[in-house]
Regions:
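Scaffold/interface architecture of coatomer-like assemblies
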Residues: 1-332
Length: 332
């Protein structure tokens, strides 16, 4: 009788390398964060709302809010300033606005300063030192070029901010006029929609000069030999409103320099006192599509919430939140 060959040894299970994490394949639908500002018509933050008072709709479909809190925290912001050989008064306005913003900063805020003309210039990387911010602004003395390539500068800024986690803000001090950017309006709008957790607060400069020229019918140029009409500025104003609306910010158009401290006080209040909502979308597709958002403030019965003051009178309020976001796209 022939001997049976010995049974093969049992297959050893692969050994787990120490320190290496276990992996599993799953579809992870990222949380969508929505910062919401609810204020009275006078700009006062309404701080008494609860989680159940908020209703979030994505493409018209109600979402379940999983995370909710009220924040009063330090900010991470970029001060993006137009500084070019345009009009002397525009430059003065831009500097006054920039210093007003610097004055509004608090101890633990992180701020970077970028100026732009033909191209962006990083004057100060992110810092918590106010003196560094003032030092960066003190460099703005003699502008180099007449061009104001706003779209290129804003795109570059958003590209840098996209690498930073958490909520970020762009304080955009500008006339809003773009002269010769390589990018067009559609491209910068697409970039704004695709950049997560960024809110833009445009602050217009040069309004007094514009108003004077409209009244006295004087011609003016945006820089040396770059003719600009009132229609160009009106279009710029509309674009700044759009940048703010898309990201949940607000655009400001001061008529006088004396308004600037109050404007930056308002912006500081807006970005330090917000409701932070988060949800996992009912649409799990990671297809890179743009999803429209709508935030409502409701009562227990689902109807619009009525807010009353201490005297029992109805208070009109406004809700500020971004209009949408771009879903992640799976890597093929």
């Amino acid at each position: 009788k022939k001997e049976e060959p010995p049974a093969p040894p049992p297959v050893e299970k692969p050994k787990k390398i120490e320190g290496m994490p276990d992996y599993s394949i799953r579809v992870d639908v990222p949380l969508v964060n929505v910062d919401v500002l609810v204020t009275t018509k006078d700009g006062q933050f309404i701080s008494t709302l609860k989680k159940d008072n908020f209703k979030v709709l994505e493409d018209g479909v109600p979402q379940t809010i999983s995370n909710f809190n009220v924040s009063e925290a330090p900010i991470t912001a970029v001060l993006l300033v137009e500084f070019a050989s345009t009009n002397y008064y525009f430059m003065v306005d831009a500097l006054n606005a920039s210093y007003s913003f610097a004055n509004s900063l608090k101890k633990n805020d992180w701020v970077a300063v970028i100026s732009y003309d033909m191209r962006p210039h990083i004057l100060a990387d992110f810092t918590q030192d106010k003196r560094t911010v003032y030092g960066a602004l003190n460099q703005l003395r003699i502008p180099g070029f007449a061009e104001t390539n706003l779209f290129d500068a804003l795109y570059d800024t958003l590209d840098r901010l996209d690498q930073i986690e958490g909520r970020k803000y762009v304080i955009l001090v500008t006339t809003g006029v773009d002269t010769f950017s390589k990018l067009n309006l559609d491209q910068i709008m697409k970039k704004i929609r695709a950049t997560k957790d960024v809110t833009i607060f445009p602050v217009s400069v040069g309004f007094a000069v514009r108003e004077y020229c409209e009244t006295h019918r004087c011609g003016y140029t945006h820089g040396i030999g770059i003719p600009v009409s009132n229609i160009d500025y009106l279009q710029a104003d509309n674009e700044m409103n759009t940048f703010a609306r898309l990201t949940g910010g607000r655009a400001y158009f001061p008529r006088f320099q004396g308004e600037l401290p109050e404007i930056f006080h308002d912006i500081s209040g807006d970005i330090r006192n917000q409701y932070n909502l988060a949800y996992r979308p009912t649409n799990p597709k990671l297809d890179g599509s743009y999803r429209k958002l709508k935030v409502e403030v409701v009562g227990p019965d689902g109807s619009p919430l009525k807010v009353r003051d201490q005297k029992g009178k109805d208070v009109k309020y406004q809700i500020v939140a971004r209009e949408g976001y771009t879903a992640k796209h799976t890597v093929e």
